[in-house]
Design a protein with these regions (language model features):
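Glycine-rich phosphate-binding loop
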Residues: 110-125
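Glycine-rich nucleotide-binding loop
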Residues: 95, 134-141, 145-147
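Short helix-loop "hinge" at the ATP-lid/N-box region of the Bergerat-fold HATPase_c
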Residues: 57-61
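A conserved short beta-strand within the histidine kinase catalytic ATPase domain
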Residues: 67-76
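Glycine-rich ATP-binding loops of the HATPase_c
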Residues: 126-131
Length: 151
């Protein structure tokens, strides 16, 4: 991972883990993607990945109960000159252990309902990191910008 040398833009928000708040996070994701110069289709995919992670936190982390989620979106410039859009999520749901053992590969031709969220997130993002904390979880999703984006 290249060290970050500058933060070009940053948005932070705290939301309840409820379906009413998903639109807030989608809007933040799309706004940051537009500020980064992403093409609309790619920005929409990125917002969908953010939506999917939030849905997973609500459904699996908080099991539909009350909770909160902190999200920070940054547009960073690495020391190597590459720009990337980073989304960091922090929840206070029970810790998820062994995330590295979950199968995030595409499922082939047989598609079953459910279980595709992490596959989608990994397909859209260049980096997906999970950290189990004492009192919750931290997720870091990053996507590198193409040279033509934001030029």
């Amino acid at each position: 991972m290249s060290p970050v040398t500058a933060c070009e833009a940053k948005i932070s928000c705290n939301v309840d883990a409820c379906s009413d708040c998903v639109h807030v996070l989608q809007s933040v994701a799309e706004l940051m993607a537009i500020r980064a110069g992403m093409e609309p289709v790619r920005a929409n995919r990125l917002a969908l990945a953010v939506d999917e992670l939030f849905a997973n936190i609500m459904r699996h982390g908080y099991a539909g109960g009350l909770g909160r989620v902190e999200m920070e979106a940054t547009l960073d410039l690495n020391a190597d000159g590459r720009r990337k859009l980073v989304f960091t999520f922090r929840d206070y749901a029970p810790c998820i252990e062994n995330m590295d053992r979950l199968d995030t590969r595409p499922r082939g031709e047989t598609i079953r309902p459910g279980g595709l969220g992490l596959c989608l997130i990994h397909a859209v993002m260049d980096e997906v990191h999970h950290e189990a904390l004492e009192d919750g979880n931290r997720w870091r999703l990053a996507v590198y910008l193409h040279e033509r984006e934001g030029a």
